[in-house]
UniProtKB/Swiss-Prot annotation:
Its main location: mitochondrion. Core subunit of the mitochondrial membrane respiratory chain NADH dehydrogenase (Complex I) that is believed to belong to the minimal assembly required for catalysis. Complex I functions in the transfer of electrons from NADH to the respiratory chain. The immediate electron acceptor for the enzyme is believed to be ubiquinone. The keyword Lyase does not apply. This is NADH-ubiquinone oxidoreductase chain 5. The keyword Transmembrane helix applies. Keywords: Electron transport, Membrane, Mitochondrion, Mitochondrion inner membrane, NAD, Respiratory chain, Translocase, Transmembrane, Transmembrane helix, Transport, Ubiquinone. It comes from Glis glis (Fat dormouse). Pfam families: NADH5_C, Proton_antipo_M, Proton_antipo_N. The chain crosses the membrane at residues 3-23, 39-59, 87-107, 117-137, 140-160, 171-191, 210-230, 241-261, 272-292, 301-320, 325-347, 360-382, 411-431, 457-477, 482-502, 583-603. It is found in: Mitochondrion inner membrane. It is an enzyme of class 7 (translocase).
Amino acid sequence: MNLFSSFTLMTFSILLYPILLSFTDQYNNNLFPNHVKTSIICAFLFSLIPTLMFINSGYDMIISNWHWMTIQTLNLTMSFKMDMFSMMFVPVALFVTWSIMEFSLWYMHSDPYINRFFKYLLLFLITMIILVTANNLFQLFIGWEGVGIMSFLLIGWWYGRPDANTAALQAVLYNRIGDIGFVLSMAWFLMHSSSWEFQQRFSSQNSSNILPLLGLILAAAGKSAQFGLHPWLPSAMEGPTPVSALLHSSTMVVAGVFLLIRFYPFIKNNQLVQSIIMCLGAITTLFTAICALTQNDIKKIIAFSTSSQLGLMMVTIGINQPYLAFFHICTHAFFKAMLFMCSGSIIHNLNDEQDIRKMGGLFKTLPFTSSELTVGSLTLTGTPYLTGFYSKDLIIESANTSYTNAWALSITLIATSLTAIYSTRIIFLLIRSKPRFVPLSPINENNPLLNNAIKRLLIGSIFAGFLITNNMTPMSIQQMTMPWYLKLTALIVTILGFMMAMELNNLSLYFKYKTTSQHVKFSNLLGFFPSTMHRLFPNTNLLISHNSASTLLDLIWLEKSTPKLLSSTQLMDSTLSSNQTGLIKLYFLSFLLSMLMVTMLII
């Protein structure tokens, strides 16, 4: 086990080398991005050794070698939890990041601040690894906030664009809502046990309390873009494509799901919390799949597919299968990163065009990228024997084993069929149809940095599911029998989705609607959620605040209470006391009244 811990710490040390190098003169060198890529390659190779040792032994290990401080009865230490989740996730994250870094060398080659960009990407990965390997809430919170800060810096990388700045702020604000739940949960754990260590937390008797679990659900909903806190995820597409690939595959968006997986010993004993997670995930996976149907921005379609898959992971946790949720995290990383990199290649070759209606016929002009985009889309839908099939099929099978999951299962099956529909739509509009882009676009995909990066992820999208299935503990699963129609549910639903997509494509060639239907508007406008939450409620609050300030403060207090009251009182007094009006009728009336009074007095 000493060798195990040594290689693990060596992996982390290799990743820190480029960060330390950035404080020297080498940071301004053009070779700094290559140093970062080489460090990630070495870290990936070193991480395979402790992973294979763990697969062989199957024993968890905790590395605790630095005591930071003691606050009364609270001990803050830096400790790493080397269990199945961390040991399987770290090589996957490093492998995917290796490909993204190599892709970034091609995609960001003309950026004047490419060295800083690579440094931020590396910090993004390091903070995610800190989150995954943390053995206490304090260290996990460092990684949690780290991925949030780095996402803000990377989403707003092109800070000269107002949309990028807005998207970065939106990501921070929505995640702040989730952070409130995380901080409150940390405070509850500290008050009731005086410890943030996972071993002490899981062995305590307070696991039945629902309050900290609700805080963790809120935190996971914010970080993993669940329904209600989801608008920041498609808006984050304003960042560079390598950022989108890393953010959606193996870093920030899966952090919320991983948080619930890490705290699963609490969740498994609380059926109400499991039901909340299952319902939240089911609503998210269906709503975002509906939104993806009519989007025209290729990156936003893939972003909504990510949110839909995150909802599926939440459903998996809700049906008492955290290991399957983690398995789907690992398989999802490969094909989602490949989809973003393929879309980035297409966007780059078409002069930053992202509208799929202005593409088409790319199989002849970009055959390599188009082929891998097709494979990635098929993997996303759960095509048999590709990586996505191994996890999605098991999830739907597990949901089929209990009638209590019928509601979530039905919604998940509908979302799975919709996944096949919008994936087929991408394939039809980008590859099969006629070219609709500017003919003068300089198209060239013959770059080894681009091709090698996507090839590695293509191999992962085909074989990673099989490899992880056969090396993920437990090695053998309990035998069970079920009807053949339940076993083939995922495949049947996917085929139905493909058939529906083909039928809709044929109908669109012959039928033209004069007006857009309300259903299409609901999908295209994201369920009217941004216009409601970002416009209606803020404008209503501003209007109420403006009217309250102008009516209550200005008109009543400042005008009628002090200066205007004095002026009106003085005007009334002066009017009553003054008899010089200049009107002959009033003078004659006053004369008559005076004569009348004198006459009455004499008589």
